[in-house]
UniProtKB/Swiss-Prot annotation:
Originating gene: glmM
Modified positions (Phosphoserine) in chain numbering: 99
Listed InterPro entries: A-D-PHexomutase_a/b/a-I, A-D-PHexomutase_a/b/a-I/II/III, A-D-PHexomutase_a/b/a-II, A-D-PHexomutase_a/b/a-III, A-D-PHexomutase_C, A-D-PHexomutase_C_sf, A-D-PHexomutase_CS, Alpha-D-phosphohexomutase_SF
Naturally occurring in which organism (per UniProt): Aliarcobacter butzleri (strain RM4018) (Arcobacter butzleri)
UniProt-recorded name of the protein: Phosphoglucosamine mutase
Function text: Catalyzes the conversion of glucosamine-6-phosphate to glucosamine-1-phosphate.
Length: 444
């Protein structure tokens, strides 16, 4: 059975992610982590979905069945789990969340003892254990070897201190009015607390989770609400998080949504000017606009590209010795601060940039114009390997000769193919996209 997608295990709660499957997955993960165990503790956190209770209990049952002691810390951002796993010296951390997805979905993300997301090889090992019923049965423990579980509710303070310490000590948020959208998700407590303790005037919305309203017409996927409130309250900036707070969307004082690539560009140059950008380089994904690459090049900053997914961004960052990277979608990684995308840590760096510049958000966060880019998602019945599709290279050749950049890939979680085209001339991009769509309608 295939379990892992592009970001952990994810699916409809009670269907793909039912209690029995989760319990088996927990046992398999526990068996895997015990091979390298030092403390025999695993940390478990979750976002605010109703199904989190069911999945949490199934995880605890599976982990304790193979001898692990479990620490449950309740609703916390995904990056907090990554940080606390290492800070509390656990063998692993587990986050129950489907990020920006609706409440019906849920997911499970695993972190190693250093707070890093598991790589594909580790995930495959867990899948192999999951599918080996004899091994699963033989590793079950009895008597005094069965693990324990306890709930700790005060670890939120550790994460708050860690994130606040990433903000320059000589700066304050006093005088800044901020609209914060918590998406009725995991940051509903910690988000406002951090900004208020640093002195900001915070107007918080969507901070009343009820188990069903996470990401519902709010948060990073629906920043238009924040946009309207920024204008209404004459705020200096708007910040929209997603359900597990690993993603950030920024809205400037005019109510305009800041593009993710512009944000990466502005932050890269800021970090370089502060002598905080290792190797004068940044990592973005294959989805990022080439205008970002050209802008960074003008500022003598190298850009490396990774596959889509913040764990792949981090892999390239480690490989190249780089401490900053992110995705167009709002996952931004400051590896000196956090081991994964962290919406709140990113927000503080954006605010530091604005304060130090002495300029308004709109003047500093949009340093370049994006090249025309079209992303089209097509449903497919079968994911035929691209290299096996007859005629594809012939279709792409004239497109590339016009100087257009193409990216064609299948979705990791849905039966869809994603077609991305980008170039300096909008009409060329539009015409080429129609050609591609027509081709794939016949080919797939």
């Amino acid at each position: 059975m295939k379990l892992f997608g592009t970001d952990g295990v994810r699916g409809k709660a009670g269907d793909f992610l039912d209690a029995i499957t989760v319990l088996k997955l927990a046992k398999a993960a526990g068996i895997y982590f015990r091979k390298h165990s030092t403390t025999n503790k695993i940390l478990v956190g979750k976002d605010t979905r109703r199904s989190g209770y069911m999945i949490e209990n199934a995880l605890v049952s599976g982990l304790t069945a193979v001898g692990y002691d479990v620490i449950q810390i309740g609703p916390m951002p995904t990056p907090a789990i990554a940080y606390l796993t290492e800070s509390m010296r656990c063998d692993a951390g587990i986050m129950i969340s489907a990020s920006h997805n609706p409440f019906e979905d849920n997911g499970i993300k695993f972190f190693d003892n250093h707070g890093n997301k598991l790589n594909t090889t580790c995930e495959e090992e867990i899948e192999n254990i999951f599918n080996d019923m004899d091994l699963m049965q033989s590793e079950q423990v009895t008597g005094r070897d069965i693990g324990s579980s306890k709930r700790i509710d005060d670890v939120i303070g550790r994460y708050i201190v860690a994130i606040k310490s990433s903000f320059p000590k000589n700066l304050t948020l006093k005088g800044l009015r901020i609209i914060l959208d918590c998406a009725n998700g995991a940051a509903y407590k910690v988000g406002p607390t951090i900004l208020e303790e640093l002195g900001a005037d915070v107007i918080t919305i969507n901070n009343k989770p009820n188990g069903f309203n996470i990401n519902e017409n709010c948060g990073a996927m629906h920043p238009e609400t924040v946009s309207n409130l920024v204008k209404e309250y004459r705020a200096d900036i708007g910040l929209a998080l997603d359900g597990d707070a690993d993603r950030l969307v920024v809205i400037d004082e005019k109510g305009e949504i800041v593009d993710g690539d512009n944000l990466l560009g502005a932050l890269s140059v800021y970090l370089k000017n502060e002598n905080l950008l290792k190797g004068d380089a940044c990592v973005a994904t294959v989805m990022s606009n080439k205008a970002l690459e050209d802008y960074l090049q003008k500022n003598k900053i190298s850009l490396f590209r990774s596959n889509v997914g913040d764990k792949y961004v981090l892999e390239v960052m480690k490989e190249k010795g780089i401490n900053f990277g992110g995705e167009q979608s709002g996952h931004i990684i400051f590896s000196d601060i956090a081991k994964t995308g962290d919406g709140l840590a990113s927000a503080l760096q954006v605010l530091a940039l604005i304060i130090k510049s002495g300029k308004k958000a709109s003047e500093i966060l949009n340093p370049f114009s994006l090249y025309p880019q079209i992303l089209h998602n097509m449903k497919v019945t079968e994911k035929i390997p691209l290299e096996q599709i007859t005629g594809l290279e012939e279709v792409l050749k004239p497109i590339r000769q016009k100087g257009l950049r193409d990216l064609i890939r299948y979705s990791g979680t849905e039966n869809k193919i994603r077609l991305l085209l980008e170039g300096k001339n909008k009409k060329d991009v539009e015409d080429a996209m129609q050609t591609l769509i027509a081709f794939f309608k016949k080919a797939l």
